[in-house]
């Protein structure tokens, strides 16, 4: 019998280093700060630690613009600090996932600097160049994800280079085999240091077809990833998760279906359909649409079903680019604690590998800065100017930034109730959220009923109960507009998971075959439920999971 891959049993914790923990009082989180909190992460129970980029970078896009893949940015520490982090994490049975950003580099990377020196540079075709249009303007109307044209003119050569993000993030030319070979060599040097794998930034963009303007999921991304797998992480059994904003379930199976041995691409992918579901067709996330649980359930069900037997889901509510989970899907006011617990139960009781973003485990919330100058995210700042120029009001754009702006996730981790050494007060240029003394790690660890201990219990249950890893998923009460509920089944065991996604008390009719069933309540955010009454009154954001040994 084939053993279970370790990544299926894992729980991943994401750290955004700039705002996690500052060890030297300079206002920026760093590697030694992360090392100092490994015991905290071990207490939570996680087994993989994903680091947002710590490589050398001019920080135009908070480290996602890399100028040297094999050096550490001075603000974060040194390579010896990085090697100590890898070793100290491993001593606690925690693997490190490095953020691999290889769709593009910084414009300060030596490859790009050399490419600018001459059209005959050996590195010119490491990047994507086109002649101007007939009028001297950009080659086509492709848009950058950060606003404006995706093409910038190099005046010295008279050619434009492609950048799907900032003008300072030129796209690499993955059609060039020398690019692929250089990236493989770099990856292997990191794997040799003992990391556990990679999270791959916007990896669905590497196979772009530039001239037809197919910027995601083009002809060759799967070929490139199969080559990468064979040359780097595949033989080592490393964990790989690809960020794929455009992926459908069919795409996800191509990237990650484990039984397709001839493909051998990634472990799993991040898909974002549940995140983009309530974005506006014209203005995207900057014009948020009302949450609709029925539509939300349908998307989660689609992915759980499509990847049930052949692929694997990455389970997440938030990350460094997204709003805080409790503000997005719960209630960050009166019901902050119970809704944070409900969201935790819902996520960790689905089938897949759960991801926890820093601060999620204590119920951190969105920011609500009134002034655009208080924000630092380049996407928010650029798109603010672009949308205002197009006629959107300041108030409307600020509502979009408050709801979905990346800086919601990038404020300092709240370790204590007041500023102390080790708590970056402005990192990365953002103010600390001034909240009550209860919204911090120190208070959470002192409160046995805190959100932290709810997460800790869920992480422990995953290690104890194979059903949570392997059990089948089937949604129940599908048409209920306020409740998301499902069954997980493995052998004779059935786990009934019920979540009220609203601030209202809700009456729920239990399906006939489950009525009066008794079991063991594994997790709850109100009083334990040990029997499924025919009609149950659920409290605001109530959530529980009931294990029935034989249905």
Curated annotation (Swiss-Prot):
| Functional pH dependence | Optimum pH is 7.0.
**What EC number(s) does its UniProt record assign?**
3.2.1.219
Name the residues annotated as catalytic in the UniProt entry. Answer: 201, 243
Q: Which UniProt keywords apply?
A: Carbohydrate metabolism, Glycosidase, Hydrolase
Its UniProt pathway annotation is: Glycan degradation; palatinose degradation
- Explain the induction of this protein: Down-regulated by sucrose and up-regulated by palatinose. Part of the palEFGHKQZ operon.
Superkingdom classification of source? Bacteria
Task: Please list the disulfide bridges.
Answer: none
Q: Does the keyword Hydrolase apply?
A: yes
Q: For this protein, what reaction is catalysed? A: 6-O-alpha-D-glucopyranosyl-D-fructose + H2O = alpha-D-glucose + D-fructose
Is the Hydrolase keyword given for this protein? yes
Q: What class of enzyme is it?
A: hydrolase
- One MF annotation (Gene Ontology) recorded for this entry: alpha-amylase activity
Q: Describe activity versus temperature.
A: Optimum temperature is 30 degrees Celsius.
Q: Which GO terms describe its biological process?
A: oligosaccharide catabolic process
Q: What does this chain do?
A: Catalyzes the hydrolysis of palatinose. Shows a strict specificity toward palatinose, and cannot release glucose from the disaccharides sucrose, maltose, trehalose and melibiose. Involved in the degradation of palatinose, a sucrose isomer that is formed as a reserve material under conditions of excess carbon availability, sequestered in a form unavailable to competitors such as fungi or the host plant, and whose consumption appears to be postponed until the preferentially metabolized carbon source (e.g. sucrose) is depleted.
Q: Which family does it belong to?
A: Belongs to the glycosyl hydrolase 13 family.
Name of the protein in question: Palatinase
| Lineage, uppermost ranks | Bacteria, Pseudomonadati, Pseudomonadota, Gammaproteobacteria, Enterobacterales
Name of encoding gene:
palQ
